[in-house]
Amino acid sequence: MIPSKNIQKIKLVTFDAFGTILHLSKPVPIVYSEVAQKYGVHATIDEIEHNSNKAFKDFSEKHKNHGKKSGLNPHDWWIKVIEHSFPTPVPAEMAEELWSYFSKKTGYTIHPLLIDFLKRNKEERKYIIGIISNTDERIRTVLEDYGIDHLIDIYAFSYDVGFEKPSREIFDYAMEKAVKLLGQEIQPEECMHLGDDLIKDVSAARNIQWNAEYCDIKTNFLKYFEQK
């Protein structure tokens, strides 16, 4: 059952990260290629794209949740993905540079409405704001680089929580954090999640009686907060 949305009752608003509030400034294969050239590593864009997609898929299956299940930390997990994205061995410094690139705001564009929305909410204190993302702490460093990490109240990263969307546990984690911040109980229908994956974001949240709407980097998500 999908709850009827009454925006006046919403207390917790959560966003997905990648594809929703953050978008890659350049495609991954292009970034990899540009950095590789600096280190004399030669590979075509097609080779890098094929290898990086395969590496990400393989490591996601063998070492789930960015290595959480295997005892790997996210840094080492990503370094392995980067190393397997090229047909020849790569210098350690090159892999570290690529890791660092995607840990800063230069690697991303941010949703054009997000910063003003967060600043206004901080002043008005309408909602508890959270991020629910199948990722690790690195996303917080990106938001720190944008200077907005303090405008977000709750960070629910799958690596830290131990569960990935669409599992309800990661949504429950965010709601429990909101309860502690507010000092009062929150009902599922008082929560809203925005994300760009119809299964892992929208359906997953609605299945546990949250409000949920589709949102990507181009979506005017402010319309979801207009009282009908």
Swiss-Prot record:
GO terms for cellular component: cytosol; nucleus. It comes from the Eukaryota. It is an enzyme of class 3 (hydrolase). The keyword Repressor does not apply. It holds the Pfam family Hydrolase. The keyword Hydrolase applies. SUPFAM superfamilies: HAD-like (SSF56784). Disulfide bonds: none annotated. GO terms for molecular function: phosphatase activity. Its main location: cytoplasm. CDD domains: HAD_dREG-2_like. It is found in: Cytoplasm; Nucleus. Keywords: Cytoplasm, Hydrolase, Nucleus. Its EC number is 3.-.-.-. Belongs to the HAD-like hydrolase superfamily. This is Putative uncharacterized hydrolase C7D4.05.
